[in-house]
Swiss-Prot record:
Domain 4Fe-4S ferredoxin-type positions: 52-82, 93-122
The protein's name in its UniProt record: NADH-quinone oxidoreductase subunit I
Enzyme class, first EC level, given as a word: translocase
EC number: 7.1.1.-
Positions contributing to [4Fe-4S] cluster 2 binding: 72, 102, 105, 108
Gene3D superfamilies in UniProt: 3.30.70.3270
UniProt-annotated location(s): Cell inner membrane
This protein's UniProt keywords: 4Fe-4S, Cell inner membrane, Cell membrane, Iron, Iron-sulfur, Membrane, Metal-binding, NAD, Quinone, Repeat, Translocase, Ubiquinone
């Protein structure tokens, strides 16, 4: 046994086998991508930046039921409902999400009965200050308008599994 170990140490077999292993992978195609110039496709269930959606007629979907606020484990959502309208519905006067607190669990999206709050496909929303990560209703509606096509496509792709 000791003679075998001495021969391996003398001829550096581990070093040579490691070198050949490295050379084998050196000439294979690379598994990485050139981010940010190339991006991997994301899943329809990806949970990124939050957005509030609108109906096709332009009216916001949120009915101020506050289910998302109640289910949020991080207590990152704050909603204030306005008075009831003539048709009996309500809308929010304030809808804030503190993205610093948010844990991107997706419970708010699952709890919403009208698919108003969604987590969109955008994952590149780094900021320089914490205040920029405090999203108000206007910012959330702007996100929804910007990403509506991708959000609708992701919801349609995920529909058989809901």
């Amino acid at each position: 046994m000791k003679l075998d170990q001495a021969a391996r140490a003398l001829f550096l077999t581990e070093l040579v086998s490691g070198f050949f292993l490295a050379m084998r992978y050196f000439f294979k195609p690379k598994a990485t991508i050139n981010y940010p110039f190339e991006k991997n496709p994301i899943s329809p269930r990806f949970r990124g930046e939050h957005a509030l959606r609108r109906y096709p007629n332009g009216e916001e979907r949120c009915i101020a039921c506050k289910l998302c606020e109640a289910i949020c484990p991080a207590q990152a959502i704050t909603i204030e409902a306005g008075p009831r309208r003539n048709d009996g519905t309500r809308r929010t006067t304030r809808y804030d999400i503190d993205m610093v607190k948010c844990i991107y669990c997706g419970f708010c999206q699952e709890a919403c009965p009208v698919d108003a709050i969604v987590e969109g496909p955008n994952f590149e929303f780094a900021t320089e200050t914490r205040e920029e990560l405090y999203y108000d209703k206007e910012k959330l509606l702007a996100n929804g308008d910007r990403w509506e096509r991708e959000i609708a496509r992701a919801i349609a792709a995920d529909a058989p599994y809901r």
